[in-house]
From Swiss-Prot:
Its EC number(s): 4.2.3.4
MF-aspect GO terms: 3-dehydroquinate synthase activity; NAD+ binding; zinc ion binding
Gene label: aroB
Species lineage: Bacteria, Pseudomonadati, Pseudomonadota, Gammaproteobacteria, Enterobacterales
Biological process per Gene Ontology, one example term: chorismate biosynthetic process
Residues where Zn(2+) binds: E184, H247, H264
Species annotation: Escherichia coli (strain K12)
Family, similarity comment: Belongs to the sugar phosphate cyclases superfamily. Dehydroquinate synthase family.
Role description: Catalyzes the conversion of 3-deoxy-D-arabino-heptulosonate 7-phosphate (DAHP) to dehydroquinate (DHQ).
Protein name: 3-dehydroquinate synthase
Pfam families cross-referenced by the UniProt entry: DHQ_synthase, DHQS_C
Amino acid sequence: MERIVVTLGERSYPITIASGLFNEPASFLPLKSGEQVMLVTNETLAPLYLDKVRGVLEQAGVNVDSVILPDGEQYKSLAVLDTVFTALLQKPHGRDTTLVALGGGVVGDLTGFAAASYQRGVRFIQVPTTLLSQVDSSVGGKTAVNHPLGKNMIGAFYQPASVVVDLDCLKTLPPRELASGLAEVIKYGIILDGAFFNWLEENLDALLRLDGPAMAYCIRRCCELKAEVVAADERETGLRALLNLGHTFGHAIEAEMGYGNWLHGEAVAAGMVMAARTSERLGQFSSAETQRIITLLKRAGLPVNGPREMSAQAYLPHMLRDKKVLAGEMRLILPLAIGKSEVRSGVSHELVLNAIADCQSA
């Protein structure tokens, strides 16, 4: 069992990583006997895990209600958020309730925002079931829903009480979702840890076949890196912005193509190549290192080009609505070397468009 602590003073919390955690009531601390829980999951995961998690919580004396959401990025919306509020109010659940997010990034982000908002804030626990949510979205307290004009535009910083990562969930993950999660894994190597990127080049095949020790190390290292960044910059005023490598471009793809048509990790993968091409055009990143990124992404089964039907010009309106924009100016996360990156302002729109075009025709 691996245990990492996100250090945020009184709001510090553990990330527990192991197989078989759904069999142990102690995995879901700080829940105690007699407490009330709203378990939030989706229609795909409910048949796989709902009864199991409900059973282990009830075994611990917890009173469990549940709400099952539709599955897909397009349902990460205000309308679906309202169904969670309605379920909480109908039971009813008070300010002492705990929301448990059992699912991937959509369930986790939406449930976290519900917890941040319901009666001005109730406790919640993240139980991520996808690789992407286990290595990234469940850690750090970013919660949100989407708007038709932009991804994650309505949300709050709100930390969970704990994160429970059961590696067994990956056994039911579709290959496309596994690849999507690997995009965020590769991101950590590019922006923060060149040695980890090297390890990924050597061990990617083991991750693709869900080798237990390799996957446990991979998830632990990603969570360690994320925890360090969040502890240093919880509200993304500086260092934490680096975690958005590829996301400014990727969110544009998701919004333009319709949420759910491109998985988040797929869009981020293409976006990371666009960021690398931008950095190349600025003369601060080598084409050889861009090729290393492209090769690893392709091995993971990820796209390295944007959608053919989306012109370079179509990216700009979305990118100019990005949450990192300051005083009307785009701020891009750009690699300087494998393992080192920066937040860069003042890059001309023409250069960015040319970098995007490089990835459309490649």
